[in-house]
Every structure is written in C-alpha cells, then in structure tokens.
C-alpha cells in the first residue's frame, strides 16, 4: 500500500509529492494528462510568473479571506525561491514584485520539477483519469479508468475548471462531492472581458495605460489601474484580469469605464484641449489628441464624441467638454467574459470551512487533503495563484 496518492500533477500536486517524499513517504502521483505540469507552460505568457514578493492574504479571494494565511506564512515567497534554487532554478524579479525564471521560459520551471520527481519514493503515472475515491479499512481505494490503487492518505490537487484547453477539469469537485464535500459557485477569473465590440475591434492590438472603473448605474463594482489591451471582442491585459472576478460574479448591466488621463483632473484635460484647439485649429478635430495617446485611439475618442471632419478651430468649449468626457469616462457595455476556456484561474471551489487551514486536511474525511486551485482560494494576477499552489502543496504534502 502506498503512503499517499496525489490526484493531479499540476503545480500544487508536484510540490505536495516532493514534500511528502522528502519525509520518507512513498508517493503515487496520478495525472490525467499525458504529462505533468502542462498548465505551467501557459503561465506568464510562456515565461511562468512563479511568484510575487507581495504575496499576502489580502491578495487572495474566497468566502474565508484568512484561510490561506497559514499556508502562505509556512511556505512564503522566500522559502519558495530558496526551494526552487535548490532544484537549480535561477530567477529574476521585476519592480512589480513578479518573479520569473532567468531563462524567461516556463519550461525551465517545469523541467526542474520533473527532474526532482524522479527521486526514489515517487511514482508518476500519467494518462490516469481518477473515477472514484472511497474510504477503505486502512485508508482509501482509488480507481481510475484503467487501474485500482490503495493508499493510506489522499491529496486532492486536481485543479479547477479554468484553462480547459491546457488541462483544466472539474474532476476534483466531483470526487470531493462523492466524499461529502461541498463547493461554492464557480466563476472564471483572470480572464478577458467581452464588451460591445464596435470600438475595441477598431483598436485591436492597441495598449493604453488607463484608470478602470466597472459600474452598474452609479454603483462602483470594481476599480483598478494599469495596461489595457483592446481586442476584437473587448478588452484584456493584467489590469483587466484583476477586475474580471468582480465582473464574473457581478451579474448583468455592467459598464467598463476607461480613463485615458488617470493622473489628470477633468478640468486639466479640458484646459489642455483648449490649448490644442489653438495650436491645431486648421486641422481636423480628430487630431486634437495626437501626442497624448495612440493616433487611432485619439481619433476614435473624437469620433465617439461626435467629431470627425470638423476643423478643430470650429469646436466650442461644449464640444471640447464632450471630447474630455470620452477621454476620461469612455464607456464600454460589458457583455460577459471569455469564460473558463480562456480564464487563468477558477474563482470559487471546495468550501474551505470543511478543511483545516493549519494542515489542509478534510474536517469530514480523515486522511483526505486538498491543495491548490480546487479549494475556494484565488489570487490576483501576477504570480499570486502559483504562490498559493506552492504554499498549499507544501503544507498538504507534510500530511500533518
């Protein structure tokens, strides 16, 4: 009988396997894909943003905002980087706190983990779709589509539904439910937003630094600031990812409001437009924002205000006010998100009040543990979700 079976060979599952083996336990890691760590290769645009120096409970979300605290403290960013250094991974950090492999290749992170999994005491079996986990006399009986195994303990590290094209599945929730556990409602998070495509489609590929406000009527649902990328279907970029959770859970009737002059007061924008009217008077109104933003974006904002072919000199102060409003409160009706297929993480998961935050052991089924995305913990964009994977995998792997 194996000491522990780990279901899921993603980031948290691999860390759990390595941690359990370090204490001398025999480990069987079951992964449904043809290789472990497939989702890692897609993180950080292929660079793998493996952690963030600002990782702390206030960067995470879920019904219990403090549930992640012990795991993050027990295996913090410093311990994580020291651990990966021991595996041979060199890293670099950015001013934002994001940490990447020095190679700028996600494959480097996966490779050092895969080599580490070759240590004695760990058996990795890929292509194993787990169909059932049942308590048995001395532990658990675990069945897959092709085999049956027995273990004294089980760690559920099956991930969430996000990124289904690179391995996201709902298996973990199904297996936990059969054992009496419950989950919250699931939403896609860290995902692109779909909006009325009229203007974004014309601006496809353009990036802009913006203040971002999501509203329902006069109510503010979410706020952020950062880089926004216009796409054929709406908007994307790190700043959009961080508000996407609020959009996913916020229901209908939402509007994304963009401020292309986030450091200016409206009156300052208006004063500047008056000056531009003087200097660009002989030119078309659509040139007024030239020099302040991408040419196509400036033209679009003037068009949205209702001005295209008019001479700049012919614009009234009221006309300039309309342009200033578009430049500081440009509105895009939100029609949804790009869903779980494109999402980087699942918001929601197994209810954390059914697990001990000091050990990640189930309060309902002794000997069952859970870690990573399958739990109701999701972080902001920027390496926070991988830090949760490492921290929770390390804690669960101790089998306390």
Q: Where do the model's predicted regions map?
A:
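Short hydrophobic core segments
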Residues: 5-7, 30, 130, 149-165, ...
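An anion/pyrophosphate-binding glycine-rich loop and adjacent beta-alpha core
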Residues: 34-36, 41-42, 50-57, 90, ...
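Glycine-rich active-site loop/strand segments that organize a redox cofactor
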Residues: 47-93
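A glycine-rich dinucleotide-binding beta-alpha-beta segment and adjacent secondary-structure elements
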Residues: 126, 298-378
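A conserved short coil-to-beta-strand element within the FAD-binding core of flavoproteins
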Residues: 126-139
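Glycine-rich loop(s) and the adjacent beta-strand/alpha-helix scaffold that form part
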Residues: 153-199
């Amino acid at each position: 009988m194996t000491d522990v079976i780990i279901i899921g060979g993603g980031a948290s599952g691999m860390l759990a396997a390595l941690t359990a083996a370090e204490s001398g336990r025999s480990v069987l890691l079951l992964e449904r894909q043809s290789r472990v760590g497939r989702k890692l290769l897609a993180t950080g645009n292929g660079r793998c943003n493996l952690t963030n120096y600002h990782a702390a409970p206030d960067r995470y979300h879920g019904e219990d905002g403090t549930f992640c605290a012990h795991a993050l403290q027990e295996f913090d960013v410093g311990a994580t980087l020291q651990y990966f250094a021991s595996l041979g991974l060199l890293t670099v950090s950015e001013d934002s706190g994001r940490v990447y492999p020095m190679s700028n290749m996600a494959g480097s992170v996966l490779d050092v983990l895969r080599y580490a999994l070759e240590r004695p005491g760990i058996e990795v079996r890929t292509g194993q779709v787990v169909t059932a986990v049942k308590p048995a006399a001395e532990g658990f009986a675990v069945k897959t589509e092709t085999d049956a195994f027995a273990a004294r303990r089980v760690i559920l590290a099956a991930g969430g539904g996000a990124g289904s094209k690179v391995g996201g599945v709902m298996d973990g929730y199904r297996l936990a439910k059969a054992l009496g556990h419950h989950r919250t409602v699931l939403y896609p998070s860290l995902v692109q937003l779909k909006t009325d495509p009229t203007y974004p489609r014309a601006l496809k590929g353009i990036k802009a630094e913006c203040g971002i406000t999501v509203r329902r009527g006069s109510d503010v649902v979410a706020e952020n600031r950062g880089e926004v990328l216009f796409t054929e279907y709406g908007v994307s970029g790190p700043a959009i990812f961080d508000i996407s959770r609020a959009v996913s859970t916020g229901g209908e009737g939402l509007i994304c409001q963009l401020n292309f002059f986030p450091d200016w007061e409206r009156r300052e924008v208006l004063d500047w437009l008056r000056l531009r009217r003087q200097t660009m008077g002989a030119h078309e109104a659509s040139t007024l924002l030239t020099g302040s933003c991408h040419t196509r974006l400036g033209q679009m904002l003037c068009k949205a205000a209702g001005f295209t072919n008019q001479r700049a000199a012919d614009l009234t102060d009221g006309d300039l006010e309309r342009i200033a409003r578009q430049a500081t409160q440009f509105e895009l009706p939100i029609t949804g998100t790009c869903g779980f297929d494109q999402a980087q993480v699942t918001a929601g998961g197994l209810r954390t009040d059914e697990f001990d935050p000091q050990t990640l052991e189930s309060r309902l089924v002794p000997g069952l543990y859970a870690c990573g995305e399958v739990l109701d913990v999701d972080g902001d964009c920027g390496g926070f979700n991988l830090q949760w994977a490492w921290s929770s995998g390390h804690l669960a792997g101790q089998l306390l």
